[in-house]
């Protein structure tokens, strides 16, 4: 099993101690670039394993601990990972597959991040967990902190989705709301710097991404996808992107599989955004994604940031990928379509990859014979507002069969007995 030997800048490869997890890369910062760190190991992850007999430990993403920063025996786990990969031909998007992360313990992909981060928090002897979150990351941090027996403070903002905030509270987190979103980071920074609270989420700007040890757990999505396709990786991986933690983690996972000879190539990656920051950076060639001028609120609060990250931008460039700006009406339409056609109800942000695939197929970027995997990051129950706004009100029927059929026709266009 590999052992973490350093934290390395995702952009310039500068090396730092393994305890540098609460900071960005000072070398890049001096050049005006804000870059996250990633875990480097004393040996190549997965090297020496038999591809014909990959890990078969039951229960969680920690079956892949030969690729990770801690052992399954040390892990703080709630059975996260091993989510289904579902073929979705009814969507009209060609050979598209859904990696359904809504099946995780708190119903989002953030459970992987939380498990990876809390495992190291426990190893480091953390006394308090701190997270700044609009919902999913905070709920996951709260749940895994509860499992680890470590107090958790979550900073969120007034207006965050009610079910998500309730979920954080249900897991025992000390939830603090702020009026100004920037105050989340200011207060969390004070806790981290003054008291040594262990951060699982971004908490300073410009944002670089989340806890490097948490991001390692996202590599397992790549392992699961590759294994599901008998190690023939898809042509495209399409993700909803805010700060790009899962984007970077998946890319790193595919790179590791290629490095040990389990796969032949790495997929091209697509970031589905609402801000347009990454598309602007790809077009300009700048090393830093810009802060966009988009001020309108979005239904996709999980990806509502106004600025992308270097870690996202670098992955898109390295894989000859793409970034697509999606609109609220597109996501709302895809939420309804996914629920009605595939029986999967995603949160609004999780619908963004499908809108992006639609755009890229129309442009000819994604070819008809190419396979795409869309990461569905969280369940619609966490924020039901978008689909509620898009659906008709159920009719009230007082009467018999005639009245019933009239109501079904008027409300739903249903004409069959």
What is the role of each PLM region?
Residues 1-417:
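PLP-dependent amino-acid enzyme catalytic core
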């Amino acid at each position: 099993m590999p052992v973490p030997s350093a934290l390395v800048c995702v952009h310039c490869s500068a090396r730092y101690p393994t305890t540098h997890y609460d900071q960005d890369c000072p070398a890049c910062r001096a050049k005006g670039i804000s870059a996250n760190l990633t875990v480097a190991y004393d040996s190549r992850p997965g090297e020496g394993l038999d591809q014909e007999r990959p890990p078969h430990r039951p229960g969680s993403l920690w079956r892949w601990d030969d690729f990770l920063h801690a052992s399954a025996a040390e892990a703080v786990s709630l059975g996260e990972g091993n989510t289904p990969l579902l073929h979705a031909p009814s969507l009209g998007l060609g050979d598209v597959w859904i990696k359904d992360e809504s099946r995780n313990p708190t119903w989002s992909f953030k459970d992987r991040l939380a498990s990876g981060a809390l495992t190291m928090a426990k190893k480091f002897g953390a006394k308090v967990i701190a997270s700044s979150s609009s919902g999913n990351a905070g709920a996951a941090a709260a749940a895994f902190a509860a499992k680890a027996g470590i107090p958790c403070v979550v900073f969120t903002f007034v207006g965050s989705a009610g079910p998500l905030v309730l979920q954080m509270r249900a897991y025992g987190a000390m939830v603090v709301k702020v009026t100004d979103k920037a105050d989340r980071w200011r207060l969390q920074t004070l806790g981290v710097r003054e008291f040594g609270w262990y951060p699982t989420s971004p908490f300073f700007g410009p944002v670089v991404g989340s806890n490097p040890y948490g991001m390692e757990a996202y590599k397992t999505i790549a392992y699961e996808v590759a294994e599901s396709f008998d190690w023939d990786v898809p042509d495209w991986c399409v993700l909803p992107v805010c700060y790009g933690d899962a984007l970077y983690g998946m890319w790193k996972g595919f790179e590791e599989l290629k490095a040990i000879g389990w796969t032949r190539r790495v997929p091209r990656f697509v970031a589905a955004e609402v801000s347009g920051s990454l598309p602007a950076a790809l077009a300009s060639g700048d090393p830093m994604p810009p802060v966009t001028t988009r001020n309108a609120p979005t239904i996709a609060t999980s990806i509502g940031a106004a600025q992308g990250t270097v870690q996202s931008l670098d992955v898109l460039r390295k894989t000859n990928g793409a970034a697509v700006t999606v609109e609220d009406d597109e996501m709302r339409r895809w939420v309804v379509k996914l629920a009605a056609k595939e029986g999967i109800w995603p949160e609004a942000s999780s619908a963004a990859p499908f809108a992006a695939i639609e755009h890229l197929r129309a442009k000819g970027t994604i070819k008809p014979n190419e396979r795409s995997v869309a990461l569905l990051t969280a369940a619609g129950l966490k924020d039901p507002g978008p689909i509620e706004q898009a659906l008709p009100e159920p009719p009230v029927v007082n009467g018999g069969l005639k009245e019933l059929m009239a109501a079904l026709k008027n409300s739903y266009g249903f004409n069959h007995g």
